[in-house]
């Protein structure tokens, strides 16, 4: 694996790959990797001749008072993991490489990015869309891989790629979970042992949504209220976002008469955890079988 720190050097190496007719798969990350990231790498490798991963803690997507400074970083550890996983190129730029001067240009999707997690974190998704656009311009991948844990982020990137006619295939990859059901996340490292146990309320709430639906609950507002109350039973959990939405458009749904997305953004201590599940609607025949 070759570690590259500058835009010019990465472009030079990838231009040679493209001239040789090799497809490029791209896995953008902020580092402190876990098995969810490695699953993205595995799929990128399976579908492309060359795999590029990036590690960049992007300051544009952190708001005031968020965890930019304390976000976990360990480039040596991450490099070893990516090399063992078979990545060809690791792009690890510094802030000065990515943003040599203050960014005047911002990519923003205010409709999709201004609600749900975006409402709780103003400006977050504009920062995400801007850095992903820049990374796509640098890497020029054939396909890019993102975890479905960040469901809203994936929806925003897909819409951005479609709106701007970017020649990139966006590939969502299923959420990878720990043994107790908690979604893998770099921020899980913040949790104390007690908080880690409390955090399982998040995947349990997704199970509760399935149970309530199967028990006959069809009103969206009733479902959201029931899930918020379920999460609030855990004293250490504060539900910032409990939303039921259309899985493709993230539009609101008055009634649960089609597949629906349950999206959760829950604070445990000072750590905010994301999770989601698409709950499919079975036909009467399927339900009876």
From Swiss-Prot:
**Which keywords belong to this entry?**
ATP-binding, Cytoplasm, Ligase, Nucleotide-binding, Pantothenate biosynthesis
Q: Where in the cell is it found?
A: Cytoplasm
**BP-aspect Gene Ontology terms:** pantothenate biosynthetic process
Per the record, the pathway is:
Cofactor biosynthesis; (R)-pantothenate biosynthesis; (R)-pantothenate from (R)-pantoate and beta-alanine: step 1/1
GO cellular component labels = cytosol
- One GO MF term attached to the UniProt entry: ATP binding
Query: So where's the catalytic machinery, residue-wise?
Result: 37 (proton donor)
Q: Where does (R)-pantoate bind?
A: 61, 153
Q: Name one Pfam family in it.
A: Pantoate_ligase
EC number(s) stated in the UniProt entry for this protein? 6.3.2.1
> Any idea which positions bind ATP?
30-37, 147-150, 176, 184-187
User: Is Phosphoprotein given among the entry's keywords?
Assistant: no
Q: Cite the binding residues for beta-alanine.
A: 61
Q: Which reaction equations make up its catalytic activity? A: (R)-pantoate + beta-alanine + ATP = (R)-pantothenate + AMP + diphosphate + H(+)
The function of this protein is: Catalyzes the condensation of pantoate with beta-alanine in an ATP-dependent reaction via a pantoyl-adenylate intermediate.
Family to which this protein belongs? Belongs to the pantothenate synthetase family.
Subunit info here reads: Homodimer.
Miscellaneous note of the record: The reaction proceeds by a bi uni uni bi ping pong mechanism.
Q: What is this protein called?
A: Pantothenate synthetase
